[in-house]
């Protein structure tokens, strides 16, 4: 098939205006190929601006690009290699190798734009995916085939928690796809080396769109990772784990592209199409009768604002929400998860059983009551509390400390061996604390242990 060519007539940042013959105008979403002194890149058609002109967003570098440069209409959206050839590899937004190894064989390629599964294809049978992380398994259990969000500001431990989840869940087997969206390259390289050392890399694909790359790359790399996961689900009928770090950078890249196109922003400077962009992306992450995609997504909170439009747009699509809080991190308790702000659709007797559900409700109640009493303690001290309230405060602090945990991925920094806590040991430990079995023990005894079996 003959490939039509066009000519760049203007360049504004990462927005290219390209002229074609009137009969050869590419469709919206089609990929255009162009060359600079740095290499070959793609652009994506986003708007028809005239009878024979289109506007395109560069999905790559524009340094060295000039008016008059020829571009080639590929006649289809960006396509990436999928299947076994990309497992154990580290790729960029185009599906090209960035791990120093030969390019993956492009036996099968899929476009990054795909329709969401039909309603009749969706699978609603859910089971719990236990992670071995106490606060998550107790308060906000993760659904197999569900979507989980890790919300937190800068430096509260989102990426470390994400890496621990990757480590623990990968040990259960299955295929994984890690998508780094606009994050630091050292984190991606570090994760790749850890996966290699732990022996789970052959079942994992790492896709990176780095912080220093163009907004087009950061906006589309999430779709590259998702497309690879969809192929495993639909064609190979496998259960897939999809890790995304960070959804905020995906939204932020969309905002930058929207601004470059001259569109009017909404509250907070976000694009007016925020809800649709997030919805189109999230609705593709689904479980069907062929297989499941279990998604765990980091969401950065600007200025620790849980009501930021980017977070609000993401909330409604999630089954489990895990909120990390700076005040808990300041106490030296990690993971710094706030059990009162975190929730899961799976925390009901149908999914976790009556015993687990009742223990989680009691833990939330005692921590909520402790927060209410904290104001009295700060002003008047513990002496002004009743005996019953003092007992409750001590138990709440023990629970708060007990929900801390040493991680495998931080062993080399802390010198403390990581722990994977089985659900029965977790529930047994919580029962003993709530029943007062450890009322005579110090609160510090419960910091960074696994279960009650580790108490000396």
Curated annotation (Swiss-Prot):
Location, primary (coarse class): membrane
The enzyme's E.C. designation: 7.1.2.2
InterPro entries: AAA+_ATPase, ATP-synt_VA_C, ATP_synth_F1_bsu, ATPase_a/bsu_AS, ATPase_alpha/beta_chains, ATPase_F1/V1/A1_a/bsu_N, ATPase_F1/V1/A1_a/bsu_N_sf, ATPase_F1/V1/A1_a/bsu_nucl-bd
GO cellular component, one term: proton-transporting ATP synthase complex
Keywords: ATP synthesis, ATP-binding, Cell membrane, CF(1), Hydrogen ion transport, Ion transport, Membrane, Nucleotide-binding, Translocase, Transport
Catalytic activity of the protein: ATP + H2O + 4 H(+)(in) = ADP + phosphate + 5 H(+)(out)
Broad enzyme group: translocase
Location(s), subcellular: Cell membrane
GO function term, MF aspect, one: ATP hydrolysis activity
UniProt topology in membrane: Peripheral membrane protein
Binding site for ATP: 152-159
Superkingdom to which the source organism belongs: Bacteria
Similarity annotation: Belongs to the ATPase alpha/beta chains family.
Listed NCBIfam families: atpD
PANTHER family to which the protein is assigned, alphabetical: ATP SYNTHASE (PTHR15184), ATP SYNTHASE SUBUNIT BETA, MITOCHONDRIAL (PTHR15184:SF71)
Function: Produces ATP from ADP in the presence of a proton gradient across the membrane. The catalytic sites are hosted primarily by the beta subunits.
Subunit structure: F-type ATPases have 2 components, CF(1) - the catalytic core - and CF(0) - the membrane proton channel. CF(1) has five subunits: alpha(3), beta(3), gamma(1), delta(1), epsilon(1). CF(0) has three main subunits: a(1), b(2) and c(9-12). The alpha and beta chains form an alternating ring which encloses part of the gamma chain. CF(1) is attached to CF(0) by a central stalk formed by the gamma and epsilon chains, while a peripheral stalk is formed by the delta and b chains.
The protein's name: ATP synthase subunit beta 1
């Amino acid at each position: 098939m003959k490939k039509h060519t066009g000519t760049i007539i203007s360049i504004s940042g990462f927005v290219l205006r390209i002229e074609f013959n009137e009969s050869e105008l590419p469709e919206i979403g089609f990929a255009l190929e162009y060359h600079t002194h740095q290499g070959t890149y793609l652009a994506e058609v986003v708007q028809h601006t005239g009878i024979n002109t289109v506007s395109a967003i560069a999905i790559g570098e524009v340094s060295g690009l000039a008016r008059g440069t020829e571009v080639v209409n590929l006649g289809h959206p960006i396509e990436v290699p999928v299947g076994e050839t990309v497992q154990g590899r580290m790729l960029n937004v185009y599906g090209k190798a960035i791990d120093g190894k030969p390019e993956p064989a492009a036996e099968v390629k899929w476009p990054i734009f795909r329709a969401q599964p039909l309603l009749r294809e969706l699978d609603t049978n859910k089971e719990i995916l236990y992670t071995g992380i106490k606060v998550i398994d107790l308060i906000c259990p993760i659904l197999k085939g569900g979507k989980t969000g890790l919300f937190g500001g800068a430096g509260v431990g989102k990426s470390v928690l994400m890496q621990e989840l990757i480590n623990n869940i990968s040990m259960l087997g299955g295929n994984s796809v890690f998508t780094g969206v606009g994050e630091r390259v050292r984190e991606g390289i570090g994760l790749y080396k850890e996966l290699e050392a732990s022996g789970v890399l052959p079942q994992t694909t790492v896709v990176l769109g780095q912080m220093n790359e163009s907004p087009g790359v950061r906006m589309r790399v999430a779709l590259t990772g998702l497309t690879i996961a969809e192929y495993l689900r639909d064609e190979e009928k496998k259960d897939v784990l999809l890790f995304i770090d960070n959804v905020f950078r995906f939204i932020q890249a969309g905002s930058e592209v929207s601004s470059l196109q001259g569109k009017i922003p909404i509250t907070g400077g976000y694009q007016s199409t925020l809800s649709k962009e997030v919805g189109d992306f999230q609705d593709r992450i689904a479980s069907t009768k062929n297989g499941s995609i279990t998604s765990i997504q980091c969401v950065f909170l600007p200025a620790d604002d849980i009501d930021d439009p980017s977070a609000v747009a993401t909330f409604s699509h999630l089954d489990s929400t895990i909120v990390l809080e700076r005040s808990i991190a300041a106490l030296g308790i990690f993971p710094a998860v706030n059990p009162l702000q975190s929730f899961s659709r799976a925390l009901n007797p149908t999914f976790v059983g009556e015993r687990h559900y009742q223990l989680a409700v009691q833990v939330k109640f005692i921590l909520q009551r402790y927060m209410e009493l904290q104001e009295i303690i700060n002003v008047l001290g513990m002496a002004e509390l009743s005996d019953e309230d003092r007992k409750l405060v001590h138990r709440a602090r023990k629970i708060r400390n007990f929900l801390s945990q040493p991680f495998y991925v931080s062993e080399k920094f802390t010198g403390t061996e990581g722990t994977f806590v089985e659900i029965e040991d977790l529930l047994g430990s919580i029962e003993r604390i709530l029943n007062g079995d450890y009322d005579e023990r110090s609160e510090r005894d419960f910091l960074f242990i696994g279960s009650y079996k580790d108490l000396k």
